[in-house]
Amino acid sequence: MKLLLLAALLTAGAAAHSISPRAVWQFRNMIKCTIPGSDPLKDYNNYGCYCGLGGWGTPVDDLDRCCQTHDHCYSQAKKLESCKFLIDNPYTNTYSYSCSGSEITCSAKNNKCEDFICNCDREAAICFSKVPYNKEYKNLDTGKFC
């Protein structure tokens, strides 16, 4: 019985740490709100040292710093008392927001954790819209340059 319980907990933990397509889609749509016509999943994944999964080293430019700040924001979310481990992981939790023009508003209906994560994504999307995109940092050899 203990082995069955352990297996169930490990499976739940592994599932909670996988990235939810819906959560990624929300962040993508926020970026599209601030940068209409962009292709966020193509453009910003594997950019510099921090944009995409993981991140380490020194950011290569301002856009990469936006991603580093976003990563740190997610790390802070995981430490919040209102964000319950397994349930409110920033990579899996979804939230409510609206986009009007290029303005993003996180919904008052969000709980504290959802609001924090929403604002992490909102601030990153705004940051992306204010800095240049340097094609030479797309698919950067992170082992060499980070």
Curated annotation (Swiss-Prot):
Q: What class of enzyme is it?
A: hydrolase
**Induction (free text):** Up-regulated in EPCAM-positive intestinal epithelial cell upon helminth infection. Up-regulated in intestinal epithelial organoids in response to stimulation with T-helper type 2 cytokines IL4 and IL13.
Question: Describe its PTM?
Answer: Activated by trypsin cleavage in the duodenum. Can also be activated by thrombin or autocatalytically.
Task: Say where the protein is mainly found.
Answer: secreted
List positions binding Ca(2+): Y50, G52, G54, D71
* Superkingdom per UniProt: Eukaryota
Mutant phenotype after disruption: Mutant mice are susceptible to H.polygyrus and N.brasiliensis infection, failing to expel larvae and retaining a sustained infection. In response to high fat diet, mutant mice are resistant to hyperlipidemia associated with reduced hepatic very low density lipoprotein production and increased triglyceride-rich lipoprotein clearance.
Q: How is the cofactor bound?
A: Binds 1 Ca(2+) ion per subunit.
Q: List the disulfide bonds.
A: C33-C99, C49-C146, C51-C67, C66-C127, C73-C120, C83-C113, C106-C118
| This protein's GO CC annotations | cell surface; extracellular region; extracellular space
Q: Which SUPFAM superfamilies match?
A: Phospholipase A2, PLA2
Tissues with expression: Expressed in pancreas, liver, lung and spleen. Expressed in EPCAM-positive intestinal epithelial cell (at protein level).
User: Metal-binding: is it a keyword of this entry?
Assistant: yes
Cofactors needed by this protein, per the record, are: Ca(2+)
Give the residues annotated as active site.
Answer: H70, D121
Q: State which Enzyme Commission number(s) the record gives.
A: 3.1.1.4
Protein localization: Secreted
- List keywords of the entry alphabetically: Autocatalytic cleavage, Calcium, Disulfide bond, Hydrolase, Lipid metabolism, Metal-binding, Phospholipid metabolism, Secreted, Signal, Zymogen
| Any one Gene Ontology molecular-function term assigned to this protein's record | bile acid binding
What does it catalyze?
A: a 1,2-diacyl-sn-glycero-3-phosphocholine + H2O = a 1-acyl-sn-glycero-3-phosphocholine + a fatty acid + H(+); 1,2-ditetradecanoyl-sn-glycero-3-phosphocholine + H2O = 1-tetradecanoyl-sn-glycero-3-phosphocholine + tetradecanoate + H(+); 1,2-dihexadecanoyl-sn-glycero-3-phosphocholine + H2O = 1-hexadecanoyl-sn-glycero-3-phosphocholine + hexadecanoate + H(+); 1-hexadecanoyl-2-(9Z-octadecenoyl)-sn-glycero-3-phosphocholine + H2O = 1-hexadecanoyl-sn-glycero-3-phosphocholine + (9Z)-octadecenoate + H(+)
Q: A GO term (biological process) for this protein? A: positive regulation of fibroblast proliferation
UniProt record similarity statement: Belongs to the phospholipase A2 family.
Q: How does it assemble?
A: Monomer or homodimer. Interacts with PLA2R1; this interaction mediates intracellular signaling as well as clearance of extracellular PLA2G1B via endocytotic pathway.
Which protein, by its recorded name, is this? Phospholipase A2
Q: What is the lineage of its organism?
A: Eukaryota, Metazoa, Chordata, Craniata, Vertebrata
